[in-house]
């Protein structure tokens, strides 16, 4: 039982002030940060942004002023928080998360939060949750999840980048390692970091120093042309670091919408139709220790997701752009058997309450839940607490490098320490 819910009015928990500001994210672009104050507590949250985004995501409001940040400023969203949203939320009980989220959604009056901006609404939603937890003097993961929050997710670490996250010829966007054989999250993080460092040395020796330049999420971005070349490098690094394929598996984020054009997929120098791409994935899974494939097809190709899920029934097929953390799209996927896992991104849907709804629907229907960052991040660690609170099987938050990525991993270390002997590392 979590602490979120309709609470009796108490002056100690009333929202006194909400203040938003424009800050920079990890790509050097503006984003929204929000502070929420009560007599007993304070919450601060900042909003991430994606590079490869689903068409059906909630709208991130940008100023479109070419004289500031190339049109990417967020002063309009900031103003919406400081005027419209603050006016409506002042005096409300900060513990009433759903009431507050629904009020903001009603204020916006659009399906995709395009009036106030999903970045404005989400910033307030996360800061409200943090202020509530602080006011109650309990950790955020405990506020979200109550006594059921005790599991630590398996990290799926993006250690080699392609696609929109890098400047090489790899079509597949992310090649990830998953230390699923660890006993604790602490051990999993150590395994991931050791493989990451080993991979870096291997790439430098084989491809030169420039191959260890990193992409948006901290993964290396060497000049590679084919997926098998990247997979061979990962297998080598896993073995060289002293681990086995049963201890550490591989995850792929194809982000296939990005290389889909006129009913064909451009990958590894080839132009493949959907059935050919399905065979390509099957061959990869049969050749490498691949546990998961994210967005293997175009974001509207529900039937192709269904076909691959049936073909690779013991592989985790993840819907990201397919579902965009939206319960209507997820419901369609569940009905069809399209994918068997949900990538949960709070900024795709735009509020904490709606993210919880999507996670709940996925879990009820036997889907794996993977909580995820975005390519443009901040030092905010809300998703770490969220992953523990909902019992997510995995968390995807980049390489064990770059401060905005390690912030999330380090927060999970603190949570595991705080939980003590009751902490349980997920076994996949």
UniProtKB/Swiss-Prot annotation:
Mg(2+) binds at residues 253, 294, 320. InterPro entries: Enolase (IPR000941), Enolase-like_C_sf (IPR036849), Enolase-like_N (IPR029017), Enolase_C (IPR020810), Enolase_CS (IPR020809), Enolase_N (IPR020811). Its EC number is 4.2.1.11. Binds a second Mg(2+) ion via substrate during catalysis. SMART domains: Enolase_C, Enolase_N. One of its GO terms (cellular component) is cell surface. Its cofactor is Mg(2+). Belongs to the enolase family. (2R)-2-phosphoglycerate binds at residues 173, 345, 374-375, 396. It is found in: Cytoplasm; Secreted; Cell surface. It holds the Pfam family Enolase_N. The active site is at residues 217, 345. One of its GO terms (molecular function) is magnesium ion binding. The keyword Iron-sulfur does not apply. Gene3D superfamilies: Enolase-like C-terminal domain, Enolase-like, N-terminal domain. GO terms for biological process: glycolytic process. It catalyses: (2R)-2-phosphoglycerate = phosphoenolpyruvate + H2O. NCBIfam families: eno. It comes from Methanosarcina mazei (strain ATCC BAA-159 / DSM 3647 / Goe1 / Go1 / JCM 11833 / OCM 88). Keywords: Cytoplasm, Glycolysis, Lyase, Magnesium, Metal-binding, Secreted. Catalyzes the reversible conversion of 2-phosphoglycerate (2-PG) into phosphoenolpyruvate (PEP). It is essential for the degradation of carbohydrates via glycolysis. Pathway: Carbohydrate degradation; glycolysis; pyruvate from D-glyceraldehyde 3-phosphate: step 4/5. This is Enolase. The keyword Magnesium applies.
């Amino acid at each position: 039982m979590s602490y979120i819910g309709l609470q009796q009015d108490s002056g100690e928990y009333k929202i006194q002030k909400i203040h938003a500001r424009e800050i920079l994210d990890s790509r050097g672009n503006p984003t929204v940060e929000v502070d929420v104050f009560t007599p007993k507590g304070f919450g601060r949250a900042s909003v991430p942004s994606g590079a490869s985004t689903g068409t059906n995501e909630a709208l991130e409001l940008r100023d479109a002023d070419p004289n500031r940040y190339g049109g990417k400023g967020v002063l309009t969203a900031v103003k919406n928080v400081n005027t419209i949203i603050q006016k409506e939320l002042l005096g409300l009980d900060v513990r009433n998360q759903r009431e507050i989220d629904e009020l903001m959604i009603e204020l916006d009056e659009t399906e995709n939060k395009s009036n106030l901006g999903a970045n404005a609404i989400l910033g307030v939603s996360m800061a409200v949750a943090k202020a509530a937890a602080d006011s109650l003097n309990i950790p955020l993961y405990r506020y979200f999840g109550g006594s059921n929050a005790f599991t630590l997710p398996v990290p799926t670490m993006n250690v080699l980048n392609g696609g929109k996250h890098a400047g090489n010829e790899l079509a597949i966007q992310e090649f990830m390692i998953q230390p699923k054989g660890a006993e604790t999250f602490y051990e999993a993080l150590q395994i991931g970091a050791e493989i990451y460092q080993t991979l870096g040395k291997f790439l430098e020796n084989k491809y030169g120093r420039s191959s260890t330049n990193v992409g948006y999420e901290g993964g290396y971005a060497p000049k590679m042309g084919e997926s098998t070349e990247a997979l061979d490098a990962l297998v080598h690094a896993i073995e060289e670091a002293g681990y086995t394929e049963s201890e550490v598996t591989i995850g792929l984020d194809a982000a296939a919408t990005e290389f889909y054009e006129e009913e064909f997929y451009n990958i590894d120098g080839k132009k493949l139709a959907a059935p050919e791409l399905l065979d390509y994935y099957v061959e990869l899974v049969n050749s490498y220790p691949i546990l998961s494939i994210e967005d293997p097809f175009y974001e509207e190709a529900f039937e192709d997701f269904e076909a691959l899920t049936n073909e690779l029934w013991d592989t985790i097929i993840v819907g990201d752009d397919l579902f965009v953390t939206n319960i209507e799209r997820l419901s369609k996927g569940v009905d069809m058997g399209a994918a068997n896992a949900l990538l949960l991104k709070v900024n795709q849907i735009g509020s904490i309450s709606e993210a919880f709804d999507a996670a709940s629907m996925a879990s009820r229907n036997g889907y794996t839940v993977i909580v995820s960052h975005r390519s443009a991040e901040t030092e905010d660690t809300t998703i770490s607490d969220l992953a523990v609170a909902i019992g997510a099987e995995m968390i995807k938050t980049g390489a064990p490098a770059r401060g905005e990525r390690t912030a999330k991993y380090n927060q999970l270390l603190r949570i595991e320490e705080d939980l003590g002997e009751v902490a349980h590392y997920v076994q996949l």
